[in-house]
């Protein structure tokens, strides 16, 4: 499952970058992505559905990979998933490009 998730992430990467660049996706503080309306999604319902579908896939893939990390690391148990998600969120914020939306650990949204 994790390999398929990584492959799908690679396939969707350009779309994710575009959506983050146009501010209809942002990096949440739990390692997942959040949807935001923008001018394009408000005017074009098909585009909005596409963004939401890709968002759903990306979040599923991220969770699959994080769950695999927890399952295969002897230092983690299932209850450590939220901690691993926070670590992932921190890395995602660090790797976000200037102008992208990011959420702090405290839940505050800002633009990097």
Q: What residue ranges belong to the model's regions?
A:
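Short, well-ordered alpha-helical segments
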Residues: 54-70
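Amphipathic, charged alpha-helical segments and their helix-to-coil junctions
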Residues: 2-49, 53, 72-112
């Amino acid at each position: 499952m994790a390999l398929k998730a990584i492959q799908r992430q690679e396939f969707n990467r350009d779309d994710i970058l575009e959506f983050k660049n146009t501010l209809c996706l942002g990096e949440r503080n739990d390692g997942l992505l959040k949807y935001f309306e923008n001018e394009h999604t408000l005017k074009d319902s098909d585009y909005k559905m596409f963004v939401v579908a890709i968002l759903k896939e990306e979040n599923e893939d991220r969770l699959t990979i994080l769950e695999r990390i927890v399952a295969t690391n002897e230092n983690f148990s299932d209850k450590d998933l939220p901690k691993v998600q926070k670590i992932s969120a921190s890395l995602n914020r660090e790797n976000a490009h200037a102008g992208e939306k990011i959420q702090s650990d405290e839940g505050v949204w800002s633009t990097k």
